[in-house]
A protein has these predicted regions:
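Low-complexity or membrane-interfacial segments used for flexible interactions
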Residues: 1-64, 71-86, 92-96, 102-194
Length: 194
């Protein structure tokens, strides 16, 4: 299991000015194993909000980049299924290992995890309601047939003050037991698309 904690930015909480997000990825015992930093433009953050194009650099404890996420600008809407979200996952940077691609559905958020050759491996299926008052929002990781859940991504409730004054999110990932390390990186990428 991996926990992803988005750092709360004081400037963002006080002024509402959207800054580049930063994250800490921790193991189940709370030890920091990676950090992630967003790279995006001020204009994109202001004009496109959460749909902005961005790159995320995931670095190990020594500061060496180990995973690189690239998300192009896409507009998403249940009315416009032609511009769905997509994220490319590279590890090492410059070498594509997979993709997270949104699948169109009018009511339920669905994403497909693909290999570097764009072959589907797993699906991530969210709830009909994306927000929950005072509770976690769970996304089920399922095989392609969607017959059962093999893992979970949980968008964790962070408390009323943090939920009201910031857009900082915390995620928990429970990986399928026999999942390839490349697909684990792609599943981590899914958290940054949700």
């Amino acid at each position: 299991q991996i926990l992803i904690h988005q750092k709360t930015e004081l400037l963002e909480a006080v002024t509402g000015f959207e800054t580049c997000n930063q994250y800490e990825l921790r193991n189940i015992m709370g030890q920091r194993i990676f950090t992630a930093k967003e790279r995006s433009t001020v204009c994109a953050r202001w004009c496109c909000g959460s749909l902005r194009p961005l790159t995320l650099q995931v670095c190990d404890y020594s500061g060496r980049e180990v995973i690189h996420f690239i998300r192009p600008l896409k507009c998403t809407s249940c009315c416009f299924p032609c511009c769905l979200q997509e994220m490319e996952v590279q590890s090492p940077p410059g070498h594509t290992i997979g993709y997270v691609v949104q699948s169109w559905h009018p009511f339920v958020p669905k994403y497909c995890l693909l290999t570097e050759s764009r072959e589907p491996v797993l699906k991530v299926v969210g709830p009909c309601l994306m927000s929950s008052c005072c509770g976690d929002v769970n996304f089920q990781v399922k095989p392609l047939c969607e017959s059962r859940s093999v893992g979970r991504i949980s968008k964790q409730w962070t408390g009323l003050p943090k939920e009201i004054f910031t857009d900082a999110d915390n995620f928990g990932i429970q990986f399928p037991k026999d999942l390839d390390v490349k697909m684990k990186a792609v599943l981590i990428g899914a958290c940054f698309v949700l």
